[in-house]
């Protein structure tokens, strides 16, 4: 209904002459609403002859604030070498969900490494490459900021598909912006954070966030803006940082029980990032213990020094187990302490014979029962302060079976360029 033709604003029938080749060329002026368009041409000399246009539609506009998104092939790169890369894809749509016009250009800046400065869209998307190299931020966390000319998101109160100032409502108004290198949602000039100033506005803005940095009180009520979107990346070491959580000490040198333990693996010593994407984690056990328990029947003297009971005593057994002892045609069960010995007291003084231990040495086994066996391509990096406590992508639990003193548990971290093992002897 808002399309015009031949001249801007015209919606009435017009007569147009053909060129020497018999062609009639008509200029169309799209309006503000998307949809199919049909143009009818009728021969003046014979109005029974007419034709309708085909495959004409109004479909694209400028990228809108909530139509800009970023994705990445991975977000934890190898910091120990130059040249590890991640592909970052910008997807852009207008407020009606249509891809923006081909050739829309979006720019990128990065806190660390190097990044392709811009890309131009085809069918609403384009991609750039983030590459590890100097500079390398000390906290191994890299902010990447993308920005593009577009329109703010708004609620179309009057339903005309056009933003009308003081009638329609802007969603999450945005003004000037910055690259939030230290992730505190504030612009810090002393850190040399990248800043983009264009607005002369003084109105309040939406709160700044990691995904959409915003400088307070730089907004206006206009529709056009420089849209922005920020992502976080980790530049992670191939050398893991271990941290014991439960069932093992924090330094991962001693396991306190023989069943389960849990730990975390980080990509830097500050425990603020995961290992590089694609790193694998495995666990194995080595059985170094071979127990040969022996049982004895020992008399116990009463108050008068005369034996009145007997004990079944087991030694050289596997700690913290229960041993089955056969004596004559009966079976007795002896609980073994941590030192490998156990005593079953209070047996009859008339009990005789040679007790025999029925025991099979069990092999030590270990398996990861929770945690990523391969570090994912995409993970939440949370905040520098909270990552070590809340990230599930760095947490692992191990179940042990049949393990005893002197057995070894080996954790193997296979990063893209390095293999690290941590062996814990029980």
Question: What positions do the PLM features span?
Answer:
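The feature marks long extracellular or luminal low-complexity segments
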Residues: 1-426
């Amino acid at each position: 209904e808002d399309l015009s033709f031949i001249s801007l604003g015209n919606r009435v029938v017009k007569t147009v002459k053909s060129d020497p080749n018999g062609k009639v060329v008509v200029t169309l002026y799209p309006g503000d609403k998307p949809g199919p368009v049909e143009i009818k041409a009728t021969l003046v000399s014979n109005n029974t002859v007419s034709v309708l246009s085909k495959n004409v539609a109004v479909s694209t506009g400028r990228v809108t604030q909530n139509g800009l998104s970023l994705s990445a092939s991975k977000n934890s790169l190898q910091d120990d070498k130059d040249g590890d890369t991640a592909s970052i894809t910008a997807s852009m749509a207008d407020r009606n969900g249509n891809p923006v016009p081909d050739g829309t250009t979006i720019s990128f800046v990065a806190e660390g490494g190097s990044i392709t400065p811009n890309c131009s869209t085809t069918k609403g998307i384009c991609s750039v490459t983030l590459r590890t190299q100097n500079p390398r931020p000390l906290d191994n966390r890299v902010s990447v900021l993308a920005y593009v000319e577009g329109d703010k998101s708004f609620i179309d109160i009057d339903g005309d598909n056009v933003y009308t100032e003081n009638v329609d409502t802007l969603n999450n108004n945005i003004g000037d912006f910055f690259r939030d290198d230290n992730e505190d949602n504030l612009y810090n000039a002393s850190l040399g954070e990248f800043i983009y100033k264009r607005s002369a506005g003084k109105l309040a803005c939406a709160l700044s966030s990691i995904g959409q940095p915003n400088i307070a009180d730089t907004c206006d009520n206009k529709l056009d803006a420089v849209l922005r979107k920020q992502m976080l990346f980790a530049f992670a070491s191939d050398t893991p940082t271990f941290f014991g959580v439960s069932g093992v000490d924090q330094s991962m040198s001693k396991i306190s029980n023989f069943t389960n333990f849990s730990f975390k693996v980080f990509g830097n010593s500050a425990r603020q990032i995961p290992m590089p994407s694609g790193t694998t984690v495995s666990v194995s056990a080595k059985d170094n213990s071979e127990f040969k328990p022996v049982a004895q029947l020992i008399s116990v003297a009463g108050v008068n020094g005369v034996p009145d009971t007997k004990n079944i005593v087991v030694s050289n057994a596997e700690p913290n187990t229960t041993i089955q002892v056969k004596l004559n045609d009966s079976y007795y069960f002896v609980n073994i302490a941590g030192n490998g010995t156990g005593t079953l007291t209070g047996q009859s003084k008339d009990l005789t014979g040679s007790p025999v231990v029925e025991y099979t040495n069990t092999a030590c086994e270990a398996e990861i029962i929770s945690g990523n066996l391969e570090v994912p391509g995409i993970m939440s990096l949370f905040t520098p302060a909270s990552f070590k406590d809340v990230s599930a992508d760095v947490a692992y639990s191990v179940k042990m079976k049949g393990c005893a003193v002197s057995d070894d548990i080996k954790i193997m971290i296979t990063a893209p360029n390095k293999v690290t093992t941590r062996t814990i002897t029980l």
